Amino acid sequence: MQDRPVHVDEDALLAAVREQWDPEVDALDHQPVGFGAHHWRATADGRARWFVTVDELGLRHDAASLESAYSGAVALHAAGLDFLHVPVVARSGTCTVALPAGSHGLAVSVTPWLGDAREPEAPGAEAALLARLHGARPVPLPQWAPRVPASFTDDLASRLGRPWTDGPLGEEARALTTSRRSRVERWYEEYAALARTVDPDQFVVTHGEPGVHNQLVTGGRVVLVDTESLMLAPAERDLSGVWPVGRDWLDRYGSVPRPDRLRLFELEWVLGEVHEYTVWLSGRHTGSPDDVVALGGLRAELEKDLG
């Protein structure tokens, strides 16, 4: 996230990092990167050591599912998938700790700082990585279920039926969503029908967002970061975001995805984003840079040509 989170006690966060991971850490510097979680660089004597993440619990994860995703990533890394950049296990024996201790709203995790990392110069590196990931022996991980709730259209109608006046961008977001409501409802009907055809026996290990924004080049190789989204799911969960691809990509990946599954996850992404952004912008907000990004994200999803 771009905004420094005022609800995160950075003194408590530093104490948690020192207690659970590295007692030599003496400073945290907020990093305005990514979207959806909060990040800090942890340093000791001026040298960067760790990338600290604080995840908000409640919408995509509860404490148990987040821990399952991270601990599953650690297990997969230990089993040979060393291209996963995974959290460091805390002294508690878990990958996450609550902030503050005993709470259920925020979870802290720590990964090694990649000081030499850069983004790939060209897309496509994920093909071979996903072939290995999807072919891996499954470990305990969260299991896919429709991200978009069955109450989605009713909830949206209820939300649109009242003013969004708890923040400066609310009414603009409500007008935008209202103008696209019928198409969103059609998308959901198609999505729900496709979701009913999914067979859990065909699930594989998936990353969730393996595109170039979650790839880093370090030590001469590409690694996948942001493993909180790991899940057992249809392989197309990872492929819809990079589709379409060329023959060379498919040759490196090793198989051809199902068009109906690609469509399912294309719709799931858009509807899930619409759900999250409308919840966000119909509630209390200040017009911060993150709020502006959320409004832009909502507009981009609603204006997609999905048929």
Q: Which stretches of residues belong to each language-model region?
A:
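ATP/Mg2+ or Mg2+-diphosphate-binding catalytic cores
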Residues: 2, 165-166, 275-307
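Active-site Asp-x-Gly
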Residues: 204-205, 216-264
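ATP-binding pocket architecture of kinase catalytic cores
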Residues: 43-145
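Protein kinase catalytic-loop region centered on the HRD/HxD motif
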Residues: 197-204
